[in-house]
């Protein structure tokens, strides 16, 4: 369950011949709703910020910038992106100011260098309306889930989760699929993300796509930064969490009334954990079985998303479709109805 998917586990296409969502009884008058995918041919500029943990090796950021440049992206580094204060990338005031600068500068994409910890300290200080009004495509992962969800809860604006500078572009090699999907999503070109699923309930519906890191999601329950999404498509991942800890957070989401209101629960990768002799057969499969039995919402596994090399960049807060067939799931990001 923790293995990174092979390259053929996910594919991307520019056309499709099935309409996802008929079974949900929706009409198709959503083409001009907020959150609909638009084409962004100008998406060639990236402003890099560090709102969470400190960057310990600046060379990883330089390498990421070189690789992004090779993909045709112009990059700019925020003045405190390499700052250090304790475990953080600068003081709270410095990190908050970097978000404000990011919203005001000219480049269309704002990408975090890395996750870690620290975004939660800033949620009550951020001018969320200014973030939404900036029209920037904010993209991050892990700890940045707190920003993604707070922006959605406070404004309804769409932001992105997936690629980050250091993890995906600053390491030994760049995953081809991660790179391609990031570019396509930033340009508004990705219409369908199809991926292999070994374990999926039948589902064919539309709803708001939301989620991200499970621990961050659980940490926002009961706060003004937790979106109130009904009939959504909730996707989840986590790293270095034992299955019982994953289950405990899922129980919290369920008992808080959140899981039961969704149309589908999509599981990404839960990576880097070790089972113990005490588990005696209890593993991630048991957690998924418990989830299905208890929550009674369709569950789809295998989403290429998480703390793994091959990952999709996904829009949080956008209306999407999801459909499953034998061994495959299709996440429909852009639906054309002629």
What are these regions (language model features)?
Residues 104-109, 262:
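Short acidic/histidine-rich motifs immediately flanking catalytic phosphotransfer sites
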Residues 269-338:
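ATP/nucleoside-binding phosphotransfer catalytic cores, i.e., glycine-rich phosphate-binding loops
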């Amino acid at each position: 369950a923790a293995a990174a998917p092979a390259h053929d586990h996910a594919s991307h296409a520019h056309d499709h011949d099935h309409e996802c969502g008929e079974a949900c009884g929706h009409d198709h008058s959503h083409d001009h709703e907020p959150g609909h995918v638009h084409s962004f041919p100008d998406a060639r500029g990236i402003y890099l910020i560090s709102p969470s943990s400190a960057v310990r090796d600046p060379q990883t950021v330089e390498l990421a910038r070189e690789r992004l440049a090779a993909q045709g992206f112009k990059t700019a580094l925020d003045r405190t992106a390499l700052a250090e204060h304790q475990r953080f990338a600068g003081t709270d005031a410095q990190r908050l100011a970097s978000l404000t600068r990011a919203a005001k500068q000219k480049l269309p994409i704002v990408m975090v260098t890395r996750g870690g910890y620290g975004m939660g300290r800033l949620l009550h200080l951020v001018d969320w309306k200014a973030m939404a009004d900036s029209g920037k495509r904010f993209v991050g992962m892990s700890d940045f889930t707190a920003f993604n969800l707070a922006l959605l809860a406070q404004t309804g604006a769409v932001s992105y989760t997936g690629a980050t500078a250091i993890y995906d572009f600053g390491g030994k090699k760049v995953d081809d699929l991660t790179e391609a999907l990031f570019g396509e999503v930033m340009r508004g070109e990705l219409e369908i993300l199809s991926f292999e699923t070994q374990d999926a309930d039948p589902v064919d519906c539309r709803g708001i796509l939301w989620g991200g890191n499970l621990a961050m999601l659980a940490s926002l329950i009961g706060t003004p930064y937790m979106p109130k999404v009904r009939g959504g498509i909730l996707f989840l991942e986590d790293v270095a969490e034992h299955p019982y800890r994953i289950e405990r957070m899922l129980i919290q989401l369920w008992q808080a009334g959140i899981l039961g209101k969704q149309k589908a629960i999509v599981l990404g990768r839960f990576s880097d954990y070790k089972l113990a002799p005490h588990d005696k057969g209890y593993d991630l499969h048991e957690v998924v079985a418990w989830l299905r039995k208890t929550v009674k919402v369709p569950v789809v596994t295998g989403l290429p998303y998480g703390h793994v090399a091959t990952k999709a960049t996904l829009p949080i807060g956008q209306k999407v479709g999801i459909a499953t067939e034998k061994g495959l799931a299709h996440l429909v990001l852009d639906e054309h109805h002629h």
